[in-house]
């Protein structure tokens, strides 16, 4: 699970295993496998870094 910030400054925790696509249009748009789309304030690189850090913690156990 990673935390992102929506455009209205509300934080949201999403399951990164359900992310299908991340686009910059110019905002960062995260499309989930369920079809739901979330627009995040963080740039794509930041979202990807959050996913990598989460996976490192998860598999380090």
Language-model regions, residue ranges each:
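Eukaryotic intrinsically disordered, low-complexity regulatory linkers and tails enriched in Ser/Thr/Pro
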Residues: 1-13, 17-61
């Amino acid at each position: 699970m990673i935390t992102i910030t929506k455009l209205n400054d509300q934080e949201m925790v999403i399951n990164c295993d359900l992310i299908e696509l991340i686009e910059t249009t110019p905002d960062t748009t995260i499309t989930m496998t369920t079809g739901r789309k979330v627009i995040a304030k963080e740039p794509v690189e930041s979202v990807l870094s959050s996913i990598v850090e989460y996976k490192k913690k998860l598999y380090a156990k």
